Amino acid sequence: NDIAYFAVPSTHVDKVQVMCGKSSFKVKNIMIMGGGKIGRLLAANLQDDYDVKLLEKNSEKAEQINDKLENTLVLTDDGLDIDFLESENISSLDCFIALTENEQINIMSSLLMKHYGVKQVIVHINSTSFFKVVRRIGVDAVISKNTSAVNEVLKIIRSDEDKLTVSRFDEIDIESVEITVDENSEYLRKELRISDLPSEICLAAIKRNNKII
């Protein structure tokens, strides 16, 4: 039940999937559950490149959303009606994204989608304490507004003239640090080896002239 994390160039993601025994696939059909601000913005950004369906349980709100999203099919449902979901052929979905404000419903619907064989399931939760649990039950990705907000604050208060970027990953209790090294950087004042790094630090990648070395 181990979870492995890889730092790779985006062009090599397919190779990692194959190495881990997971075949890559192209996303075409996407279903978003939740017509809140995040769901609407996401649908608006995806609808021109993908076949997008958006579920909103409030019929009046669904009608308003439908008027604004020309290339998104807006449906009225809470995401837990099995008969309705089967009528929408959910087993053919490439990606399901649960974005309601109710994290219990998000988790339940995500488990249901996994049961029906949806290739990629993404769930939004409010409490970061659920991160590890949700990942363990088979959800492919977990997002949280709280974590996103924390990351943005970290980037601001711990930045050094845009030379250092910090991001936090609460589900594994680590922080990633991206450092831009220039000719005046203190990091170049002495020769460093990977073996010189403290045991708590792992060097993931070095990028030079737009290439990973």
Show the residue positions of the predicted features.
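Cytosolic regulatory regions of ion transport systems
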Residues: N1-I213
